Amino acid sequence: MVNIEIDEGSGFCFGVTTAIRKAEEELAKGNTLYCLGDIVHNGQECERLKKMGLITINHEEFAQLHDAKVLLRAHGEPPETYAIARTNNIEIIDATCPVVLRLQKRIKQEYDNVPASQDTQIVIYGKNGHAEVLGLVGQTHGKAIVIETPAEAAHLDFTKDIRLYSQTTKSLEEFWQIIEYIKEHISPDATFEYYDTICRQVANRMPNIRKFAAAHDLIFFVCGRKSSNGKILYQECKKINPNSYLIDQPEEIDRNLLEDVRSIGICGATSTPKWLMEECKKAILNEK
């Protein structure tokens, strides 16, 4: 008999849970509700909410909208979004994650407090174009420098002061690699300060996912293709257990992989709904 375990630590983080709850509450009232961008980087959950009536729009469509109600997802938005909402009489339901909100305020404060004469580089370790990163860069009027990997730290100007922050869902390990690299290369005349702004709910999943991956013969990591956090966690799974496979939905399960395994683990990202992992378990059991 095959043992199938769903990782208790996987599933929505509190920021995503709050955003979805707010959307469901509003839709339950029968109101028309728009969401600026995918509410979560998971196609199956987005489809579920679409069936409930949630209308997903992009920033161009948002700018053309008037007298409407719009939900801002957990990733956060730049100041320009709020300015458009005021101009267009858009009622905002702000579901920005409190961890992201605090980070936005810190970066804005850093930017506002730097004298014009002081050429300080505000650096964000994150994914270029990611919704959260766009919101963070927006706090600096587009002046912040985004680096995606430790290798990109080499492009910084080490003769100038550096203030380093991180997207909340990035790898803590890589963040420290960047810190060490900058410390080694910064000019004695320049200052370097860094702030560990990675969400602990995300960071703490790394040791848990390692333990979970090691405990099973086969791992199915359930995650939307757009999930930044999911890519990091899946790579860690694969490192610990080479017999790990990334799937977006139950239909992607390769039945050939189920042969001769005694223990199967199902886990996911902070954007993976529990119900989807349960569906994957059901799909496996139907075949076994």
Curated annotation (Swiss-Prot):
Binding site for dimethylallyl diphosphate: 41, 75, 130, 227-229, 271
Residues making up the signal peptide according to the UniProt record: none
Residues where (2E)-4-hydroxy-3-methylbut-2-enyl diphosphate binds: 41, 75, 130, 168, 227-229, 271
GO annotation (BP), single: dimethylallyl diphosphate biosynthetic process
Key words, A-Z: 4Fe-4S, Iron, Iron-sulfur, Isoprene biosynthesis, Metal-binding, Oxidoreductase
Entry annotated with the keyword Cytoplasm: no
E.C. code: 1.17.7.4
Similarity remark: Belongs to the IspH family.
Function noted in UniProt: Catalyzes the conversion of 1-hydroxy-2-methyl-2-(E)-butenyl 4-diphosphate (HMBPP) into a mixture of isopentenyl diphosphate (IPP) and dimethylallyl diphosphate (DMAPP). Acts in the terminal step of the DOXP/MEP pathway for isoprenoid precursor biosynthesis.
Record-given protein name: 4-hydroxy-3-methylbut-2-enyl diphosphate reductase
Gene designation per UniProt: ispH
